[in-house]
Regions:
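Bacterial N-terminal signal peptides that target proteins for export
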Residues: 1-9
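Bacterial N-terminal signal peptides
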Residues: 8-18
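Vicinal oxygen chelate
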Residues: 24-38, 40-51, 90-103, 107-108, 114-203, 210, ...
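A generic structural micro-feature
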Residues: 37, 84-86, 119-122, 200, ...
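Core segments of cupin and vicinal oxygen chelate
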Residues: 48-99, 144, 160-164, 211-264, ...
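Extended intrinsically disordered, low-complexity coil regions enriched in Ser, Thr, Gly, Ala
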Residues: 53, 57-73, 107-109, 118-124, ...
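Short, charged/polar, Gly/Pro-enriched secondary-structure boundary elements
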Residues: 111-112, 178, 275-276, 341
Length: 348
């Protein structure tokens, strides 16, 4: 009898142990690291520019952004954050609605221009998507200001594509060649705030889109490590998509991700054609092609340790005191995602 009771007790202990391990496994992120990064917000989106005054004029006069701050920074923390020795940087934050961009000019040392033959399926492609209340009027404003087209012209995505039907979109380039999208949602799509009457033409930034080589690899980074959630997916193709991207035969897998606050991040994986070029291994923050997305983390020190142990490629020398003055972001570091897009992780 005693032997039988001991046997039953042993089985109970074993069962409880198995249940405990299983429960822990179910609550862990897929790679065991999401809690270390835990992104709670997205933005601003940064772009390196060659001539700050020219860029400020373009974004304020043409796209109605408002200047929020204008600072010049230099010193060891600047060098260590951007990974550029001898850096002296002017940073201008500009706001449109609830969202912001940061224009970054390297006064020293200057970098390389965006390749003149850049295409939308090259992996260095990244744009901000500005929501407009009237596509025809917005396009007319851009034409009056002689912007460089990236799309053939505004496109209305077809009704057969349920997830994108009725969306109007157009790609163009700013004065440095950075791609920008204007986008108008139909009534049944987009956040409620994009449909509130405001009397404004350019409303705010819905998302930043990045070209990726493999959606699953990017999801492991942004969803599983950073903790962002998938908010939507679609597969886009046809003449409208080809002329929007200005890439013949374009067929895209599109995945939208969100954090608790700020604009989304959208993956653009070209299923065809597959001839997009990778981000150059020697791309640096002072090159005009450089863009980076700022992500706000609950625990930036844990995030830095996690990325370091996972051998993620760092742009920064490590976690540094953030020289860019933002409310609450005292420390930060910059890393690269699986395709080489720069991501700044900053403290909440």
């Amino acid at each position: 009898m005693r032997r039988r009771l001991l046997g039953i007790f042993s089985l109970l202990v074993l069962a409880l142990s198995v249940w405990n391990v299983s429960a822990r496994a179910q609550t862990q992120p897929k790679n065991g690291s999401a809690s270390a990064a835990q992104i709670v917000g997205v933005g601003p989106i940064q772009m390196t520019v060659a001539d700050m005054d020219r860029s400020v004029d373009f974004y304020s006069r043409v796209l109605t952004f408002e200047k929020a701050s204008d600072t010049e920074i230099a010193g060891e923390n600047v060098e260590h954050l951007f990974g550029v020795f001898g850096a002296r940087v002017r940073v201008v934050r500009m706001r449109l609605g609830d969202e912001s961009i940061e224009l970054v000019q390297f006064i020293a040392p200057s970098g390389r221009a965006i390749p003149a033959d850049s295409r939308s399926n090259d992996l260095w492609f990244q744009h901000i998507a500005i929501i407009v209340s009237d596509m025809d009027r917005a396009y007319q404003v851009l034409r009056e200001n002689r912007v460089e087209h990236a799309s053939t012209g505004p496109q209305r995505l077809p009704d057969w594509n349920k997830n994108a039907a009725g969306i109007k979109a157009f790609y163009f380039k700013d004065r440095d060649g950075h791609p920008v999208e204007i986008l108008q949602f139909p009534e049944d799509k987009g956040a409620a705030k994009w449909h509130k009457p405001s009397g404004r033409l350019f409303l705010g930034i819905d998302h930043t889109a990045i070209a990726v080589s493999n959606t699953e690899s990017s999801l492991k980074f942004y969803r599983d490590v950073l903790g962002m959630r998938v908010a939507g997916e679609s597969e886009n193709f046809g003449t409208e998509q080809e002329h929007l991207n200005n890439v013949f035969g374009a067929r895209l897998r599109i995945t939208a991700l969100r954090a608790a606050a700020g604009p989304g991040i959208e993956f653009l994986e070209y299923l065809t054609p597959r001839d997009g070029r990778p981000i150059p291994a020697d791309e640096r923050a002072n090159d005009i092609v450089h863009r980076q997305t700022v992500l706000i983390a609950l625990d930036v020190e844990a995030a830095a340790q996690n990325f370091s142990s996972n051998k993620t490629r760092f742009v920064s020398s490590g976690l540094v005191v953030n020289p860019i003055q933002r409310s609450g972001t005292r420390k930060a570091f910059i890393v690269r995602d699986p395709d080489g897009h720069a991501i700044e992780i900053a403290a909440e």
